[in-house]
């Protein structure tokens, strides 16, 4: 597994081990491994941007989960080097292995499709028109699999806005604001969301099914929520009475570079990244998950309120709220 030390990846490691799988994660020397240090798994030293370092990592593995990606790159070209070329390196290492993996799952993003617009709900057949460099790089990573012509059995899952314990991005900055008694009004947009546990279950179900080979899937909770519904659910999850404040997007565009600079200086994830503002600015990210429900019985066990309650409790226990 690549990205096994991260937010989603560490939860995936736990779930796979609980199911009896033997897990090997790709790690770099400077990776923060706190979430997986106590798990009975193997580690392979390597980096997806260095193809030569991947040879040993993919040797004698049955399945590959490719979750590693860069989200907040200071240089736009890093998105394509890590997300696009990194996927190509990993795929080539798999193909050159004496015993190539039987399955390969890529964790992509709805950013690879671009926003749906107010009156559409995207499914997997919708044309991809990514707007951000991140979205374009994830689209590039998907194309690396489409070029394989059956040489490696692959599956792509496109993830929506994922939240849950251990996340320092996504909904976490908004939850911190709500915890201070403020609900931001961000227009009438809608987006699909997903609790991390449901995403993990979905990825495992997808790679265990023979129906999913050569297919792309949208997974997450359906139907989408309005941002007002999300903000209200956050306040309830933390038992907070919050006032609604309209925050103009042009102000967010002014704040985000300052937040990014402070984050870079402090070597921490910025409170507000320009990529997040762009995501919010294009307000409608509506997707249809029925193909996943049909092909491998995907379901979201956690509704937004349930997932936020679990998430808020974890943040509180970690003294992050």
For every predicted segment, state its role.
Residues 32-35, 41-85, 95, 113:
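NAD(P)H-binding glycine-rich loop region in Rossmannoid oxidoreductase-like domains
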Residues 49, 78-89, 128, 132, ...:
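Glycine-rich NAD(P)-binding loop of the Rossmann-fold in SDR/ketoreductase-type enzymes
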Residues 88-133:
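Conserved Rossmann-fold NAD(P)-dependent oxidoreductase catalytic core, especially the SDR/UDP-sugar
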Residues 139, 151-153, 163-172, 206-217, ...:
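Glycine/proline-rich active-site loop of Rossmann-fold NAD(P)-dependent oxidoreductases
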